A protein has these predicted regions:
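N-terminal export signals
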Residues: 1-33
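Extracellular/periplasmic solute-recognition and catalytic clefts
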Residues: 150-154, 374, 432-443, 475-534, ...
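A local structural motif
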Residues: 88-93, 113-128, 325, 384, ...
Length: 642
């Protein structure tokens, strides 16, 4: 086949049913296919002279959230994509954000090539990261397009617990952007989420979920790219290559609390490509705004450079029973304005977030029914009463927490519109100034425990710890694009690049004396989201074929220069996440096999190698697969139509 006929610019195969295919029976019946008037094709029964059947993009059954489901299709469906019996498969709009990584355009072209090899035309649409999360990553209705791709951000909780990725396949979570619903998977997800105190049992359930999702080829899990950053090592010592974050990005604070100046300057300047939009962390839109402000605020617990749970405002946690957790709080902590931190601040923060729907703290407070102050002696002790058992409460949720001072927030009636001139926290850095679009400046908060050498050594580990007084100030300078950042590094205007760069870009920057390329492992994947509302991607046979058409190893070797790990199977959980990572069977790269699978399922190719929808009896088989959503041709004992 020739793929070139299907390509559009980035600007504007009965051999295998996939790994471990098993028959799980038919799912709920969907809305029956509708007629496409005046199509000129034969109807579904194979008789000539009638209109062709068609299947529209739609929710295929009821959902447990009011904004999704077959009963709200007219309001919830944000785009059109229709399968018409015997006609050519239409062009697929495919969204990506070129500015997200130095190689995202090349990744988008790889996705395009995979679909082209299956005869599917692709329209690549480049969007800005700053706009796509509000417009195209919608928690209420999911992605409003057939395909989108993404390199996930290295939020600490994603390296601590399986839920941030696995629960995206649950129909009740806002992170289910691809609108995937599989009752067997949902039941197992609920079971693991409530398995408290038995890590081995929970890991076994998570392994079952990973196997089912991989077998269902529910998305394309492509790679774990190495995190490549650039920093000035002549004037600064103590960079920490935290997995996912690398040495200089903003999801973890370890580098900036461990750095020791080796020259005259005690102000560390990090060059970045974008500024922040406000100073209100709990009610922000997330992204860089949230991450940079986490230097101002502390949570109850933190994630270490070894991705272990370590104390922060709370020094320990006791599980009283499945729905009760008590924590001792750190003694002697002060807010940046000199007021003492108390257990009442923790209780207030939780209740305030719940009353005012703080989006960036929803993951933390969601399972909490109430907070009680058990004791005020020492640092104090608080009790969390949960609504139900929650296995992730003491991993991802407490690490996501950010505690705010009651004396600063209690009189704020409209917190979502609040933009404090001087945000006050207990974190290792206090806020100094913000010049919108230009820079943020913070200074060391001496009272924070991070500046105690003994405590910091225990938190970061002997391998990375460097003794000393640390930096006095940190500045985020909004320099521009990566090329401008490299120039600023080479001229000495900045001390680090606060975003990832390509291997070639890092090598170019490191040609300057005192500048070093630094790498770290990654626990967040690059993936391709397929909308399960679209009839093409509701067909499991097509999803499996696409899995065979994507060259994961080739992309890592040819585009990433070998600096990354191709993912085996469609499994978003990294091997770093022990014991929850489960081995999943890979889909061998074989476009010819993928094409033959489609032909056996009733698809055909026209004279220009474009994919054509099935017709006649093959259309009926296709409609059955689409209605089911989780069964291939072999699963349903359908004949070979090739």
């Amino acid at each position: 086949m020739s793929a070139s006929a299907h390509s559009r610019g980035a600007e504007d195969s009965g051999l295998s049913a996939g790994p471990s295919a098993t028959h799980r029976g038919r799912g709920p019946t969907a809305r029956r296919p509708t007629r496409a008037p005046d199509s000129g094709s034969t109807d579904s029964g194979g008789d000539s002279g009638g209109d062709a059947d068609s299947i529209e993009t739609q929710f295929w059954e009821e959902w447990p959230v009011e904004t999704k489901g077959s009963d709200v299709n007219d309001e919830a469906i944000q785009f059109e994509y229709t399968a018409v019996e015997g006609e050519g498969v239409p062009e697929v709009d495919t969204h990506f954000a070129q500015a997200e990584t130095p190689w995202m355009r090349e990744f988008a072209l790889e996705v395009q090539q995979s679909l082209n090899d299956l005869g599917v035309p692709v329209n690549l649409i480049n969007v800005q990261p700053s706009t796509r999360y509000g417009e195209f990553w919608r928690a209420d209705v999911g992605h409003p397009m057939p395909i989108t791709m993404n390199l996930h951000g290295p939020d600490p909780q994603r390296g601590l617990d399986p839920n941030p990725f696995l629960m995206r396949a649950h129909p009740e979570t806002g992170g289910n952007y691809y609108n995937y619903k599989n009752d067997e998977v949902t039941e197992l997800l609920d079971e693991q989420a409530q398995t408290i105190g038995d890590t081995e049992a929970r890991a076994e359930i998570c392994g079952e979920v990973a196997q089912l999702l991989n077998e269902d080829a529910y998305l394309i899990a492509a790679n774990f790219p190495e995190v490549i950053t650039v920093a000035n090592t002549a004037d600064w010592e103590g960079y920490i290559p935290t997995p996912g974050n690398g040495t200089t990005r903003d999801s973890f604070i370890w580098t900036q609390v461990n750095l020791q100046p080796q020259g005259d300057s005690t102000t560390w300047v990090k060059g970045v490509t974008s500024g922040i939009q406000g100073t209100n962390l709990p009610f922000s839109s997330g992204g860089q705004e949230e991450k940079r402000l986490l230097n101002v605020y502390d949570g109850l617990f933190d994630a270490s450079p070894q991705l272990e749970i370590v104390p922060a405002l709370a020094t320990n946690a006791d599980v009283v029973d499945d729905t009760t957790v008590e924590m001792d709080l750190r003694e002697g902590v002060e807010w940046h304005d000199g007021e003492p931190f108390t257990p009442q601040d923790v209780k207030f923060s939780v209740e305030y977030y719940q009353e005012n729907d703080a989006p960036q703290q929803a993951a933390f407070v969601r399972p909490i029914d109430s907070v009680e102050i058990v004791s005020e002696s020492g640092g104090g002790r608080v009790r969390f009463n949960l609504t139900e058992p929650d296995a992730s409460f003491l991993t991802q949720r407490v690490v996501r927490s950010a505690i705010i001072p009651e004396h600063r927030w209690s009189d704020i009636d409209s917190p979502a519109q609040y933009n404090p001139d001087n945000p006050v926290g207990t974190g290792p850095f206090s806020f100094v100034s913000w010049e919108q679009g230009s820079q943020i400046r913070m200074e060391k908060h001496e009272n924070n425990w991070m500046w105690d050498d003994d405590i910091r050594r225990e938190l970061v580990g002997e391998e990375y710890f460097v003794a000393g007084d640390g930096i006095d100030e940190i500045v985020w300078a909004n320099v521009g694009n990566v090329s401008t950042l490299i120039g600023a590094m080479q001229s000495g205007d900045i001390d680090a690049i606060g975003t990832t760069v390509s291997n070639a870009q890092a090598d170019r920057a490191a040609n300057t004396s005192g500048v070093e390329k630094q790498t770290a492992r990654n626990y967040v994947p690059t993936d391709v989201h397929l909308s399960h509302l679209v009839p093409l991607f509701r067909d499991k046979t097509f999803r499996v074929a696409l899995s065979h058409a994507f060259d994961k190893e080739g992309f890592v070797e040819n585009t990433l220069g070998g600096r990354g790990e191709a993912i085996e199977g469609q499994n978003l959980l990294t091997p770093i996440l022990t014991p929850y990572h489960a081995e999943t069977e890979p889909y061998e790269y074989d476009p010819e096999t993928a094409q033959e699978m489609l032909q056996q399922a009733g698809y055909t190719f026209d004279g220009d190698d474009n994919l054509v929808w099935p017709e006649g009896d093959a259309w009926d088989a296709f409609a059955e697969r689409v209605e089911n959503g989780h069964a291939s041709r072999q699963d349903l004992d359908q004949p070979d139509f090739s």
